[in-house]
């Protein structure tokens, strides 16, 4: 059974047979769900600052929970 992967940039799951696997010179394996994620990674963008990434949305939800509990 093929495995679901997680995008190395945005954090969303990648369906088997979709996306792109990139191996860097140092042997690090990166998975990207779209060319948008790959290009953003290559340009050095921070996924925590982009509203469309799951990483940003999860971080925002944690902050909201912390503020509500205070």
Curated annotation (Swiss-Prot):
Q: Which GO terms describe its cellular component?
A: ribonucleoprotein complex; ribosome
* Biological process, per Gene Ontology: translation
The cofactor binding remark recorded in the entry reads: Binds 1 zinc ion per subunit.
Q: Which SUPFAM superfamilies does this one have?
A: Glucocorticoid receptor-like (DNA-binding domain)
What Gene Ontology terms describe what this protein does at the molecular function level?
rRNA binding; structural constituent of ribosome; zinc ion binding
Query: Which CDD domains does the annotation name?
Result: Ribosomal_L24e_L24
Cofactor requirement: Zn(2+)
Q: Which domain of life is it from?
A: Archaea
Tell me its family.
Answer: Belongs to the eukaryotic ribosomal protein eL24 family.
On subunit structure and binding partners, the annotation says: Part of the 50S ribosomal subunit. Forms a cluster with proteins L3 and L14.
Q: What name appears for this protein in its UniProt entry?
A: Large ribosomal subunit protein eL24
Q: What is the lineage of its organism?
A: Archaea, Methanobacteriati, Methanobacteriota, Methanomada group, Methanococci
């Amino acid at each position: 059974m093929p495995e679901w992967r997680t995008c190395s940039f945005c954090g969303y799951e990648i369906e088997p047979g979709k996306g792109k696997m990139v191996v860097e010179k140092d042997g690090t394996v990166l998975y990207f769900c779209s060319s948008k994620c790959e290009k953003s990674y290559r340009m050095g963008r921070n996924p925590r600052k982009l509203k469309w990434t799951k990483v940003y949305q999860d971080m925002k939800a944690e902050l909201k929970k912390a503020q509500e509990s205070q």
